[in-house]
Amino acid sequence: MSEPRSWLRRERRTQLTIVGHSPPHAGTSRRLRSTPDPSGRPPVLELLAHELVLRHAATRRDRIALVDGDTAITYGELAHRIAAIATGLQGRGVRKGDRVVVLIPMSPELYLVLLAVAAIGATAVFVEPKSTLSEIARAVRIARPRAFVAIPRAHALRAAFRDVGRVPLAVLVGPRLLARAAGAVALEDLEIEHDGAALPAVPMTADDPVLLTFSSGSTGAPKAATRSHAFLAAQHAAIERLVDRRSWRRSGRDPGRDDVDMSAFAIVVLSSLCAGVTAVLPPLGRGGVDDVDGAALVRVIDERGVSVLSGSPAFLAPIFDAARGRHLFGVRRVVSGGAPVPVAMCEAADEVLLPKGRFLVAYGSTEAEPIATIEASEVRRDTAAATRAGRGLCVGRPDPEIRLRLLAPAGGPLAIGPEGIDGLSVRDGEVGEVTVAGPHVNQTYYRNPAAVRATKVVDETGTVWHRTGDAGYLDGDGRLWIVGRIADTVRRGDRDYYPAAVEALAQELPGVERAALVADRAGGARLVVQAARGARDSRRITDHLAAAGVPVDAVAFARALPVDPRHRAKLDYRSIREEHSA
């Protein structure tokens, strides 16, 4: 598939000059003139990804940008340190177009490195810190990086895996003594050596790649999604629509107060920095969202004055539990996504967010986030009963910049015929594959043409559409309902049963904590249930489902159902099938 036409071909040179706390040139805050985009996308900010953040060093250099425990970094300090790291990387051979593997937990260092890499025109290859050693090695093989910037644990790979050991530049994020022992350069030394340096001037366009992020791999091998500067600018604009800062400021309810954000999503923290607000990094233990201390997080939220909170359901649940019986008075907006958000969490939101807080459910994927959103109040009022009746999870209406189609499910690549994209679409009310296009929808994968063929469709206008792999339908109010992954659909007889719809139905039973619908080898439907000890009654479960018209051939019980390592909330169907599909 040919690359999509560029919507901004004009090269320009980064004009930010930062020495100490010097501000960027005012001229970098221009917007694009309203030139029509050949793909139909609206104009976005002309600023490149790093400029979106560094512009704030000019107008609010003393404002706190990042808070990590007892450490606070201002926008001026952030710009100063980014310039030093960017100069150090460039001085050690990292050039425009190179790739830099970045394996750093959520911390100030993560954002310093990501933005420094962007500033020199290189591409950061973000690898989840909880990745296994083989997954890290695989990412290096795919990316063929010029540099490897990582925590000490990951540097052990340089001796164990040839591909990792061959990376020309190794930078260790941690103690300088460990760096010397590992034969690496310490990130701290890069900063010290180039303290006070000006930000390198590198020509680049908005279409240049700036970030590679891997899909979760829950439905196959992880794919490296390419994000350009334009993509990140559009995604930042979409996230700002969720957070809704403008209407909040216009309302005058908190005059003069700027938001303080806390998010367990790395990309949302980056967006907070683009917005020029304070981002408080959540205090997580080594286990990440598996190790959330809800009471400790509530204390930090109160002490730091957090007003916007976001994370997966697994991250938010302990916070909500700890806040019951009291209110998170300063929190005005909570956004949850990354995995299905239970109806019960939407119902619990009022108890902790009154009097002014609002809870928003966001639906998206690595390739397109956000796609659709719905307020918890609308879930409670309009859609919860249907979810409990097995009709799926309502994720709301599409983002204003998202174009959405529901395509007839297909097992392989799709080709556009004379009728265009609409010729592949299902009829109103039917279940189809959620397929999207827009300025914050990924258009390609790095070095993976097979994945591009399988998940991308180019229509008659040249627009690239992304097939999410999710099955869903639209209701009469234009809301999107998700019923499960197409690949995980269970065919029983002449009828399809969609996992998310059936699982939500089962989870309405008292004591049923989680459920997974899988096909067994005999062609039947098997429900694997994680339930409290006193609730492990297979007859009760099958009768409940049968009453809703869902026949299940067998019920199996598991102590805990496996979930994705990233958000700790999305079911790992592949592992469940391997263990329970006998």
Language model features: what each stretch is:
Residues 21, 92, 120-190, 531-539, ...:
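Structural core segment of the AMP-binding/adenylate-forming
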Residues 45, 54, 62-107, 111, ...:
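Conserved AMP-binding/adenylate-forming core of the ANL superfamily
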Residues 47, 103, 422-499, 508:
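Conserved ATP-binding/catalytic segment of the ANL
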Residues 61-62, 185, 191-214, 221, ...:
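Conserved pre-ATP/AMP-binding loop-to-beta segment of ANL
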Residues 74-76, 203, 208-237, 278:
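Conserved AMP-binding A3 loop
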Residues 122-123, 234-307, 322:
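Conserved AMP-binding/adenylation subdomain of ANL enzymes
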Residues 173, 186-189, 277, 307-310, ...:
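Gly/Ser/Thr-rich phosphate-binding loop
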Residues 490, 516-517, 542-582:
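Conserved C-terminal "lid"/linker of ANL adenylate-forming enzymes
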